[in-house]
Amino acid sequence: MHLIDTNIFLEVLLSQEKKDVCKKILDANIGNQYLSDFSLHSIGVILFKNGKENIFKKFVVDVVPKVEIITLSKELYKNLVDAKKDTGLDFDDVYQFKIAEEYGLEIITMDKDFDRVRDKIKITFVEHIV
């Protein structure tokens, strides 16, 4: 089971350089994908900020029903500060890390900062999938 990082979805939604490989990853993992509530909100913020509300609406209609949206348990929020201190990850990444750890998920990402937690959870980088 995979926690798909925000950057994978944004790469496709914003038609960026690696959109084709990211789309293949998303298509290949239908039914095994998890999206954090934080990622969903981040995608919305970025798309709205860039005047792409129509893309967000399409995403919510086409993609969101195919993924499981998960949130960090309330009692684990207190662990985010210690996890940040231990790993050096920023808030976005430490949230993804802790949610993946809680649910026993592998993170699929393009964010090299996740190298810092490879010894704690399974991380797969897009370039290793190609």
Question: What do these predicted regions represent?
Answer:
Residues 1, 66, 70, 101-130:
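Acidic, PIN/NYN-like endoribonuclease modules and their adjacent C-terminal/linker elements
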Residues 1-35, 48-58, 130:
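Short, well-structured N-terminal submotif of metal-dependent ribonuclease cores
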Residues 9, 40, 114-115:
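A generic structural signal for short hydrophobic patches within well-formed alpha-helices
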Residues 13-17, 47, 84, 118-121:
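Short, flexible helix/strand-to-coil boundary loops that buttress conserved ligand/catalytic motifs
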Residues 23-30, 62-64, 98-100, 117:
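Alpha-helix C-terminal capping segments
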Residues 40-68, 75-76:
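Active-site-proximal, substrate-binding regions of enzyme catalytic domains
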Residues 42-43, 79, 116-117:
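Phosphate- and divalent-cation-binding pockets in alpha/beta enzyme and binding domains
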Residues 68-110:
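Active-site neighborhoods of divalent-metal-dependent phosphate/nucleic-acid chemistry enzymes
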